[in-house]
Amino acid sequence: MPETVRGCTKLFEVQVHHAPDKACAKTLSKAVVTSSLTKAAIYGKDANWGRILCAMGYSGAAFNPLKVDISLQSKKGSLTIVKDGVATDYSEEKATEILAEDAVTAVIDIHNGEVTATAWGCDLTHEYISINADYRS
């Protein structure tokens, strides 16, 4: 997908696992994948888990932040950055390596059911903003 979206450099996938129902899982995954702050962090290769939890929080879906686990994945591996709502002692270098790939997945486990949902989007780049800010119809 990055090649098909002008100004996009990465496919960004968000998986939400163990939600109580499909609506909750979809709402959370869509909130994270569409968050401008999260998309900008993905572009900047920044494992900013606070932006992910923030997007989840304003989604309106019910979840317990103290039960949330967040991992980042790509062809370069997997890294757990949040466990039970608390940042892990993860390697920034490894996180940057994972986030440098052209396809990145955030795996979020809310430990509150058996339902999973996945949403797809892209990063938010300077070029994307320029293309769309300068476009005139």
Residues of each region from the PLM?
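N-terminal glycine-/lysine-enriched basic segments
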Residues: 1-27, 33
